[in-house]
Amino acid sequence: MDREEARKRIEELREKINYHNYRYYVLDQPEISDYEYDMLMRELIELEEKYPEFKTPDSPSQRVGGEPLDEFEPFTHIVPMLSLANAFTAEEIKEFDRRVKEAVGEVEYVVEPKIDGLSVELVYENGMFTVGSTRGDGIVGENVTPNLKTIKSIPLRLKDSVNLVVRGEVFMPKASFAKLNEERAERGESLFANPRNAAAGSVRQLDPKVTAKRDLDIFIFNLQRIEGRDFKTHVEALEFLKEQGFKVIPLIKKCTTIEEVIKAIEELGEMKDSLPYDIDGAVIKVNELDKREILGQTAKDYRWAIAFKYPAEMKKTKIVDIVVQVGRTGALTPTAVLEPVVISGSVVSRATLHNEDYIKEKDIRIGDTVLVHKAGGIIPEVVEVVKEERTGDEKAFVMPDKCPECGALAVRLPGEAVRRCTGLNCPAQIARRIIHFASKDAMDIEGLGPAIISQLLSKGLIQNVADLYYLKYRDLITLERMGDKSARNLLEAIEKSKKRDLDRLLFGLGINLIGSKAAQVIAEHFKSMDNIMKAKYEDFLELPDIGPKMARSIVTFFSEEQNRRVVERLKEAGVNMEKLSTGKVSNIFEGKIFVLTGALKNYTRDEAARLIVERGGKVTNSVSKKTDYLIVGADPGSKLKKAQELGVKIINEEQFEAMLKGDIQP
């Protein structure tokens, strides 16, 4: 590799790593395994060391992680939450040992499991839990104190009135993860990919009540700082924390030689699949705290510790067939049917192939011999093809352009990796579609929740959203827990929903990429469902805030005959198909830009946004110098602080309502 090739490869690696950093640290939606990520980072570090002229301060090799999101207040860590350097072989562990001993002489090590969860910092003042934060970028994280307080293994008060800071890993036990996904599947909600994603998503919920319902746990693995006490070793400090009421990291083993360390790593690796929680490695730490002080740290990691990463177990097997499954969002996912093989203690007979690009990139064919592992220790995944074992009888796979469940068009929009079914009648996604249609921001059918929808579907009383308007009292009274009053109330709510405005109907149809704001723009312009269905791709592109993907999505949706039939049946049932007149509503917010933060008492965010847009205003998601008003509800996020810094006018819900009534002029 010459200098120019190295420069291009370094740029490519940085782009990939920054992308995956964003997916992992900011969105909590990783697309690759930790092992694959580590290999990318290792290659970048090696190239930058070989070509130091290309190393820059903003390279991902020089940083700890991703930026925190805006939903929570930022919190600057008392002690920076640095990462650990990684090792993948016994020789690399021995090299770490040599570096340590060159600096401080003989040492004692501890080996402990590396819990696969979400790292947090807990601050205690006078023995009381005061602040809990996520890692964020290592310097500034997110203040998630109310959510962490719902985890029962986190003590709210310590035994002693001490000031201290600890670091721990929040995780979800394997059994709890399986139960949670089972419950989400029953409700028609998207599933978590692995326990780590479930833990991270639960901690970062805006509503602590949601977090409280999730079975989260924590292991404390380090005492970051304490006032008025000294400890000689890490193990001694952990014993103190245990006495104070903390649940400390288990399976710790003290080692006096590097050979003992390697043996402890191997023993931990042998038992990891049988543990009730996920681990993705072992952490090796210097036990003596005074020697840690001497060893210190770099800008991104500690010199006194290293993480050994276990490679994902891979097995060889054969692809018998490739089938396509339709998810609840209409996404078509190719799945490999395999000759059964045991991986990490369980029999695997199917593996995800993600999407058609993944199949094409890896040149996966029916009949191929492949290597399979469990991504995140949970999801079976085809990693690569063993091409030298091909016989010539393998068959190429072609993604269908029709939904295998309902026969509707399966469309892949530009820039998207997945193909989606466009059918309103698709049985694979109908429950989710009806739940969305009945939701508060769409047709707002009070009393029509997931449980009732599930019963209606299982009894064959409905097959699509239009069928709701043909239900009779005799249909509803047969449902479980449905009495006379409940049945009549639901029929009344369904009848009432017929008068909803056009934008709410359009949003309720669940057209891919068309949210409530886009639906408002479209309804305001075209005025009727007939006009919308007749409109061409170019017509939608002329509208503000409607891009090419959204335009293509809505045109494709209405080109599908079964969707047009559903709309026709809605019309026959008496559902409003016109943009309702807003009466005497004036353009009092003309040219004004609003941002909303926190929970409003009398409106959802979409309802408040609709009122603003109807009156000529615009609603954006972030505060800037162009923002005219920030409407603040309960438990506002960091937008409030930014608005104060920029001098943006801040109003509460009562002032907003006064503006709507004309009592206050904007």
UniProtKB/Swiss-Prot annotation:
Superkingdom, natural source: Bacteria
Residues involved in Zn(2+) binding: C403, C406, C421, C426
Domain BRCT: 584-666
EC number(s) recorded for this UniProt protein: 6.5.1.2
SMART domains linked: BRCT, HhH1, LIGANc
GO terms under biological process: DNA repair; DNA replication
Catalytic activity: NAD(+) + (deoxyribonucleotide)n-3'-hydroxyl + 5'-phospho-(deoxyribonucleotide)m = (deoxyribonucleotide)n+m + AMP + beta-nicotinamide D-nucleotide
Cofactor(s) the protein needs: Mg(2+); Mn(2+)
Function: DNA ligase that catalyzes the formation of phosphodiester linkages between 5'-phosphoryl and 3'-hydroxyl groups in double-stranded DNA using NAD as a coenzyme and as the energy source for the reaction. It is essential for DNA replication and repair of damaged DNA.
Family statement: Belongs to the NAD-dependent DNA ligase family. LigA subfamily.
Protein name: DNA ligase
Species of provenance: Caldanaerobacter subterraneus subsp. tengcongensis (strain DSM 15242 / JCM 11007 / NBRC 100824 / MB4)
